[in-house]
Amino acid sequence: MSSSVEYRIVTTWERKEDIETRSKTNRQDKNSLYVRTFEVEGNLWFVSSDITRHFNSLIPINECWNSISDHMMTIHTTTAGHFFEKVVDYYGLCALINFEEDPKRKELLEFVNNIHTNNLINVATPELVKVYMTDEEKKVFI
């Protein structure tokens, strides 16, 4: 990967049982979802591991928080001329995928796959967890 690109994980959350499942099988089952937010050279990216659509899809986001309810949020953003609508709940991110090539997409996928392969789980908390979870729900997450 290019050393000129800086990556910083902003937030991550997963269900404990998903981490245990993945460490045993080295795969994600269809119910195993997580979301990460990355800051790459000042731009925010969401990453999803919903294997029923595509493994570790990356979607850039720009001021795209449209609606927030107690446990759900819809995100709208446009990338490479494509419109995306994503629903986030406290189980993670389900994303529609843009399969078009992007110069940084390959680097980002390699970076995320490296994190996944080596089980380098950076768990953050802050705002996203605070928005989506009750105290009881937080107990099933790391």
Predicted regions located by residue number:
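Positively charged, aromatic-accented nucleic-acid-binding surfaces
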Residues: M1-L58, T79-I142
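Short, charged amphipathic alpha-helical segments flanked by flexible coils
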Residues: S69-T79
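Major-groove recognition helix of helix-turn-helix-like DNA-binding domains
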Residues: I61-H71
